[in-house]
A protein has these predicted regions:
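Sec-dependent N-terminal signal peptides
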Residues: 5-16
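PPIase-associated folding chaperone regions across multiple families
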Residues: 116-175, 188, 208-315
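Short, well-ordered alpha-helical segments enriched in acidic and aromatic residues
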Residues: 183-193
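C-terminal motif of bacterial Sec signal peptides marking the signal peptidase cleavage site
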Residues: 19-22
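Secretory-pathway/luminal and periplasmic proteins that interact with or process carbohydrate-rich
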Residues: 111-116, 193-199
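Short helix-loop boundary/capping segments
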Residues: 196-209, 213
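N-terminal targeting/tethering segments
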Residues: 24-121
């Protein structure tokens, strides 16, 4: 197993100057790249890492030349936010990364210097990032056999002039949020097939709906309407679902079977309740926090989905 790399082919094109310049939004944000709860992530540390990458990593230099470095800089901030959330989760869940396993992961990625270039961090942060990867996998493994959600919803497809599938899905989501007691009736409109069931995280793995396992569906509070696109690569199909309940079973059950990448993604999703509880604020020069995607987005138009609090949820 190697450290999960950061460089991705699909990036948005905005100038590097936007990343390296810009204005803060006030005294509480001006010297911070992000604020997680009461903890500030120093802006100068993020800028220092950006400068190191531009000076030492050819892939980062290529992105800068293509004017595509903005999305990469948001990934830097995202990883630091995730680290802060993970510190809270690890303390609550009693998780620890074995130092020997951390070393092995780094060595399997070519050592500290090569790993730094692979994942896009300064060498002195490689060990922290490797430990975070292991902890996220542990967190995912811990919740796979225990977590389930009770949902009612439907899949929205098809577009019409002036109305995309996302538009229609969002409109349905807002209707459900306004009258959650009518959710089954509302989702059945237009001949849609109603999804009204309890989804167990462990049962989704290996199924045709495996993509849902790491989705926002399992990270929101009960009484939230989730509007997401589970498989963007498979066409414009949007899931609209009211999460009526979220249950975490007792410990001691057999751990779920999943590959390390899937466990990592599920672990990341399990940080969503902590992010919601603590609050995450991003310096506007980098964008805004996307709770649906557990990432930093350029603006709300780039959110991975929509999370709408329902007005009431009747038992």
């Amino acid at each position: 197993m190697r450290i999960i790399g950061r460089f991705a082919p699909v990036l948005t094109a905005v100038t590097v100057a936007f990343v390296l310049a810009g204005c803060g939004s006030g005294p509480s944000q001006v010297s911070s790249a992000a604020i997680v709860g009461q903890h500030a992530i120093p802006l100068d540390e993020v800028q220092q890492e950006i400068q190191w990458l531009l000076a030492n990593v050819p892939a980062a230099q290529d992105l800068a030349e293509q004017r595509k470095f903005d999305n990469f800089s948001r990934k830097i901030v995202q990883e630091r936010v995730i680290h802060e959330l993970l510190l809270i989760a690890a303390e609550r869940e009693g998780l620890q990364a074995d130092p020997a396993e951390v070393t092995q992961l780094i060595e399997s990625s070519g050592g500290t210097e090569e790993a730094a270039k692979l994942v896009g961090v300064e060498p002195d942060r490689v060990r922290e990032l490797a430990a975070d990867q292991i902890l996220l996998q542990q967190l995912g493994e811990k919740y796979v056999p225990r977590l389930s959600v009770d949902v009612v919803g439907a899949v929205v497809t098809g577009e019409s002039p002036g109305s995309t599938a996302e538009d229609r899905a969002l409109a349905l989501g807002e209707q459900i949020a306004a009258a959650p007691e009518r959710a089954p009736e509302l989702v059945a409109g237009d001949g849609r097939q109603v999804i009204d069931q309890q989804l167990a995280l462990s049962e989704l793995l290996g199924s045709d709906s495996a993509a849902l396992a790491a989705s926002a569906l399992f990270g929101v509070a009960p009484g939230t309407v989730v509007v997401i696109q589970p498989n963007p690569q498979q066409g414009a199909a949007w899931l609209v679902a009211l999460v009526r309940d979220r249950k975490v079973g007792t410990a001691g059950e057999e751990p779920g079977q999943a590959d390390p990448q899937t466990l990592y993604n599920i672990g990341l999703r399990m940080l969503a309740p902590i992010a919601r509880e603590a609050g995450v604020r991003i310096n506007p020069r980098y964008g805004v926090w996307d709770q649906a995607g557990m990432t930093v987005a350029a603006d709300e138009r780039d959110f991975a989905g929509h999370l709408i609090p329902a007005r009431t949820v009747r038992p």
